[in-house]
C-alpha cells in the first residue's frame, strides 16, 4: 500500500528546468528558482517530462514523507512556473495601504502607521488603497506573509473592519439590542 498522493507523477511544464542530484531537488522557471532536500527513504527521478517519486519501503512514516515530498515538489514546480498570490482587502473608514519603496505602509486606525517590508522572494503590490497583493514562488511564504499582514488588524465581527483575504467571509454578530 503506497501513498496515494506520493505515487502520482509531477508534470514538468515547458520552461521549467528540474535537477535532481542525490537527495537535492531544484527547480528553475520564469518566476524564479527553488530547492528542496528530499527526505531519506524517498527517491526522485525524472522520466521524460515527469518527476516520479518512489518510497524505499511501505512503513507508515515513509508513506507520509512520500506524499509530503510529492506535494512540496509539485508546489515548487507550479511556483517557479506560475507563482502564487494572495489578495488582501482592507475594510474600514480611513483604513488604507500606500506603497513605500519595496514595502507597504498601512494606516489602520492606530495612533501610528505600520510599515511591512517583504522577505526575499516576495513582492507586495498595492492595487488600490484598499487592496494588497502578496506574490512569490513559495506557497508557504506567500501564505505566511499574507497571514502576518492580516494579523495587523484582523477583521472584527460587528462591522467587519480590518484586513481580510479577498475570498474570506466574515461571520457577523448582532450588535447590542436597542430599547
UniProtKB/Swiss-Prot annotation:
One of its GO terms (cellular component) is cytosolic large ribosomal subunit. PROSITE patterns: RIBOSOMAL_L6_1. Keywords: Ribonucleoprotein, Ribosomal protein, RNA-binding, rRNA-binding. GO terms for biological process: cytoplasmic translation. Pfam families: Ribosomal_L6 (PF00347). Part of the 50S ribosomal subunit. PANTHER family: 60S/50S RIBOSOMAL PROTEIN L6/L9, LARGE RIBOSOMAL SUBUNIT PROTEIN UL6M. This protein binds to the 23S rRNA, and is important in its secondary structure. It is located near the subunit interface in the base of the L7/L12 stalk, and near the tRNA binding site of the peptidyltransferase center. Belongs to the universal ribosomal protein uL6 family. This is Large ribosomal subunit protein uL6. It comes from Bifidobacterium longum (strain NCC 2705). The lineage of its organism: Bacteria, Bacillati, Actinomycetota, Actinomycetes, Bifidobacteriales.
Amino acid at each position: 500500500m503506497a501513498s496515494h498522493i506520493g505515487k502520482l507523477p509531477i508534470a514538468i511544464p515547458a520552461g521549467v528546468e528540474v535537477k535532481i542530484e542525490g537527495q537535492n531537488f531544484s527547480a528553475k522557471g520564469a518566476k524564479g528558482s527553488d530547492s528542496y532536500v528530499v527526505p531519506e527513504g524517498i527517491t526522485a527521478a525524472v522520466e521524460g517530462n515527469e518527476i516520479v517519486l518512489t518510497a524505499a519501503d511501505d512503513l507508515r512514516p515513509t508513506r507520509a514523507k512520500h506524499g509530503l515530498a510529492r506535494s512540496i515538489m509539485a508546489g515548487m514546480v507550479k511556483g517557479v512556473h506560475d507563482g502564487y498570490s494572495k489578495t488582501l482587502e482592507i475594510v474600514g473608514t480611513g483604513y488604507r495601504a500606500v506603497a513605500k519603496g519595496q514595502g507597504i505602509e498601512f494606516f489602520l486606525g492606530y495612533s501610528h502607521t505600520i510599515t511591512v517590508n517583504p522577505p526575499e522572494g516576495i513582492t507586495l503590490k498595492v492595487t488600490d488603497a484598499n487592496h494588497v497583493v502578496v506574490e512569490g514562488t513559495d506557497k508557504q511564504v506567500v501564505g505566511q506573509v499574507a497571514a502576518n499582514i492580516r494579523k495587523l488588524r484582523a477583521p472584527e465581527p460587528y462591522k467587519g473592519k480590518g484586513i481580510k483575504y479577498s475570498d474570506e467571509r466574515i461571520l457577523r454578530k448582532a450588535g447590542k439590542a436597542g430599547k
